[in-house]
Amino acid sequence: MDIRYEVGPKDFKTYTTEEMREAFLVESLFEEGALHLSYSHYDRLIIGGAVPSHEAIALDAGDALKTDYFLERRELAVINIGGKGTVTVGKDTYKMAKRDCLYVGRGNEHVEFASNDPQQPARFYLVSATAHQTYPTKLAPIGEAQPTKLGSDAESNNRTIYKYIHKDGIESCQLMVGMTLLEPNNMWNTMPAHLHDRRMEAYLYFDMEEDTRVFHFMGQPQETRHLVIKNEQAVISPPWSIHSGVGTSNYTFIWAMAGENYTFTDMDTVAMEELK
């Protein structure tokens, strides 16, 4: 398991591009036949990728968590961004197509990922946070998710937001997870920017062509930097940082939050004149 330690805003001001990438960019989540996990010390969030091929892949706690099994003290969100597959939780198996989301509650010992077709494998994106309460496992197919339209072509941010795990959707202990799809010829996300000092956030960018990139902006509003991101790479965003991006083409991203409070609207908007 890859470990990412916390960085404060004062130290961040001195970081080189390479130091920023080492601290905040997760480049290699998805590998056929493998499970990759990255542990952030910001709110103890774990993000990961599982790409089962001919054999199923079990969710393994490894040595880093010091628990008997992965979800002993954790909850989990699984979003499929690839071909059709299944997730088995205990004795129950859930079918998952692209963009479907599965919430798995604390205390489930056995979680296993499989693909229907090894030639078109499922690509499961995983997000896990610590949990002090158990909520039931629940599937949210993309067709049943409630879409919210925001932005406009004039602002280059015409997009659809799907909220999966939140106060008025699938209940969780502290995870909030959703997905944003940008329409063609629209490139901006989360601008005007905002902060939520009570929660960290992670972005996974995907549905991108090989030669396209997203320029992800981060840092305190008065001291911003950027990361250049490829398809299926993730960014860890500290609570003190903005998290916004612009692409060379449209894209999709999954956002996931953990920390204090459980209200989607708990955020502090940053005025344009504050950004530097």
UniProtKB/Swiss-Prot annotation:
For the keyword S-adenosyl-L-methionine, the answer is no
The GO biological-process annotations, alphabetized, read as: D-galacturonate catabolic process; D-glucuronate catabolic process; pectin catabolic process
* UniProt keywords, alphabetically: Isomerase, Metal-binding, Zinc
EC number(s) recorded for this UniProt protein:
5.3.1.17
- Give the first-level EC class, as a single word: isomerase
Q: Which reaction does it catalyse?
A: 5-dehydro-4-deoxy-D-glucuronate = 3-deoxy-D-glycero-2,5-hexodiulosonate
Q: Which GO terms describe its molecular function?
A: 4-deoxy-L-threo-5-hexosulose-uronate ketol-isomerase activity; zinc ion binding
Provide the binding site for Zn(2+): H194, H196, E201, H243
Q: In which pathway does it act?
A: Glycan metabolism; pectin degradation; 2-dehydro-3-deoxy-D-gluconate from pectin: step 4/5
Tell me the protein family, please.
Answer: Belongs to the KduI family.
Mind telling me which HAMAP family this protein's record contains? KduI
Summarize the protein's role.
Catalyzes the isomerization of 5-dehydro-4-deoxy-D-glucuronate to 3-deoxy-D-glycero-2,5-hexodiulosonate.
> Could you identify this protein by its name?
4-deoxy-L-threo-5-hexosulose-uronate ketol-isomerase
Source organism phylogeny: Bacteria, Bacillati, Bacillota, Bacilli, Bacillales
Tell me the gene name. kduI
